[in-house]
Amino acid sequence: MGSFPCPQKIEQVLLSGQGLNELSFASRPACASMLVERVPHHGVVYGLGQETAVAQPNLPEGFDFTDPDVYAERIPYQEFAELRKTAPIWWNPQPPEIGGFHDDGYWVVSKLEDVKEVSRRSDVFSTHENTAIVRFADDIPRENIEMQRFILINKDAPEHTKLRKLVSRGFTPRAINSLREELTERAEKIVKEAAESGAGDFVTQVACELPLQAIAELLGVPQEDRLKVFDWSNQMTGYDDPELDIDPQAASMEILGYAYQMADERKKCPADDIVTTLIEADIDGNELSPEEFGFFVILLAVAGNETTRNAITHGMMAFLDHPDQWELYKKERPKTTADEIVRWATPVNSFQRTALEDTELGGVQIKKGQRVVMLYGSANFDEDAFENPEKFDIMRENNPHVGFGGTGAHFCLGANLARLEIDLIFNAIADHLPDISKLGDPRRLRSGWLNGIKEFQVDYKTASGGCPVRH
C-alpha cells in the first residue's frame, strides 16, 4: 500500500460525519390517546406515482418521524405505538426540500420482525444508494451524501463483505478481551474522579469517558490526543443542534488527517493495535484503500464513542427512574443488564435503506428507489416481540432487540465491546456511587436519528459504607 494522501484530496467530505454507527448504540411509551391534531383517514398513500391502500394512523398533522425538533424534546413513543397498532408500514410524506434527498417521503417500518426483514434483505434494500442516514441538512449537496459511501455502513455487497472481513479482525473476542483489564481500571478511575466532584454532568464526567478510552486504546491514540479526537467526534454528530458552536466539515478533515498520520506512523513502526492490523490486512488480494481506512477511523471514533456513551447515560437515567431496578442491580449484577439498557436506550433511533427493485414488505408494495426507514426505537418496544416492553427489566432473558442495528450484514461490529463497557461502568458506579441521584432533567441533542443526551446533572453522593455485595 502506498503512502496515505493528505486529507485535502477529499474536498467534498461527509457533512458532519452523518453516516455513522456500524459500531454500534427519555420519555417512555404512553397512551396514544394523548395525541391531539389528527390526520384524517384517507385510506390511500401516494409515493413515487404509487397508490397503495393502507390504514392511516392517527398522528399529529404533518408529523415527520425524522424531524430533529421532535427528538430534541422527546422520543415519540406514543406515535410509534400508533403505527404499530394501525399501520406498521406507513408512507410518511416529506417535502422534497427537507432532509437532503429531494423525494416526496419515505416508508417507516415500526415492528420488530419487519425491521429485521429489511436488515436481512440487503440484496434488495441498499445502504449504498442513499446511505443509512435518514436525514441530512436540507441544503447538503448530493456529492456530500455520495462521499459517505466510503463509510462501511454505507456499502453493499460485495464491497461491504470485503471491508467487513478486513476490519472485523480488530474486533475478535481475543481483541476485545485484551482490553478488559485496562478498561476495568479506567472505569474505576472515572467513577472515583467523578465522586470527588460531589455533583456534576454525568455525560461528560462518566458516560463519555470509558467509550473514549476504549476506542483510543483500540486505535493506539496517545493519551494527550484523546480529548482532541473526542472533540472532533462530537462536532461530527452535532450538526443539527443550533446550541453547539461547531464546524463539522473542519472536524471531518481533522480526523481524516489524523487517521492518515497514524497509518503512516504504523507503516514505519508497527504496533499491537487495530491501525496496524488494518493497514497490514490483505485478504483475497485486497486491502483497504487510503480513503476506506480514513473513513473507517471516523466510523470507529464517532460511532463507537457516541452510541455507547448515550446508552450509558440512558441506562443511568433508567435506573434512577426505576429505583427498584437499581437496588436489584447493586445486589445481583445480572449479565442481562447491558442488553436491556441498549434496548431501552436505543442510541440510534433509526437508519434507512433504499429499495433496489419493486418489492413487498409486510403486505405493502415498495417501489424501486423509495426509502425505507427502520424505526429501531419503535421495534424495541413491540408488544408482539417483548413481554411488557414498557417495563425496564434488567432480568429480561428473551430480549431480541435491534439496538445494535438489527440483523444481517450490518449488525453492529462493536456490539461486544459496547456490552463490556456498559457492564464495567455500571459495576463501578454500583460499587462507588450506589446513592447517585439526579438533580435535573436531561438536555437532549437535536438530531433526526441519534437518541443523544447533551447534559445530565447528578449528585454523586459518595457512599460511606461501600458496595452492598462483594465481588
From Swiss-Prot:
It catalyses: cholest-4-en-3-one + 6 reduced [2Fe-2S]-[ferredoxin] + 3 O2 + 5 H(+) = (25S)-3-oxocholest-4-en-26-oate + 6 oxidized [2Fe-2S]-[ferredoxin] + 4 H2O. Disruption phenotype: Cells lacking this gene fail to grow in the presence of cholesterol. Substrate binds at G238. Its cofactor is heme. Heme binds at C412. Keywords: Cholesterol metabolism, Heme, Iron, Lipid degradation, Lipid metabolism, Metal-binding, Monooxygenase, NAD, Oxidoreductase, Steroid metabolism, Sterol metabolism. Its EC number is 1.14.15.29. This is Steroid C26-monooxygenase. It comes from Rhodococcus jostii (strain RHA1).
